[in-house]
Amino acid sequence: MQYVSTRAAASAASQSPQQFSDILLGGLAPDGGLYLPTEYPQVTGAELDAWRKLSYAELAFEILKKFATDIPEADLKALTAKTYTADVYRNVREGESAADITPLRVLEASKGRKLVLQALSNGPTLAFKDMAMQLLGNLFEYALAKKNAELNIFGATSGDTGSAAEYAMRGKKGIRVFMLSPHKKMSAFQTAQMFSLQDPNIFNIAVEGVFDDCQDMVKAVSNDLPFKAKQKIGTVNSINWARVVAQVVYYFRGYLAATTSNEQKVSFTCLLYTSPSPRD
């Protein structure tokens, strides 16, 4: 599987396709575009039937191997097995199994239709972003070790992205995280999550201002390509394709767990709870 920039047609410099491991560490393309696959893999009915019997980690491997073709399958399988464990996603409700990773609960059933809730916030920081960030941390560490390289992650957050990224990257070899956040404008819970970390590779920077001020600084650095390359700067926000692919997995998991055959259809609705930020 190869990847090209969304701006490839307008930029000759970005025409050369990249491998998954390359775009994993690079984030945005040099021309400022997003990396996308040159083609999208198809999933057959037979594959869906087989996937119904898999654990979450096994399902993640089956989906990711369609996109990360430059990573040996044995290595990729080990990475998903390391990431999606009951110990990592242990913050389940009473009666739910942590081994399910994203357990489903039927809220309502009537006339052959069901309303089902899929839990995505059982990870270390109780945010749905743990689902992708935990895998991203392991992928980063793996790819950097292969290249004997280092990466400085520079990000901005108003809460959940920062804590999820830091808990995923803490202690990872070859990785340092520099996270900007607006001073006194996050929830007390998320502030405590981030600023209580003592890992030597995690750096929290409180900025006088609002989230947009933090984000503007990150964008300025990202747009300075020579500086970005020299300082080996990467990103963990949603422009990183690896994070998008990791999120694809729980949609498949939700569908397969909520249905018994491929003929059944499911409509997804995303519900996101956000805690209010303190007033100035």
Which stretches of residues belong to each language-model region?
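Conserved small/polar residues in nucleotide/adenosyl-binding loops
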Residues: 274-280
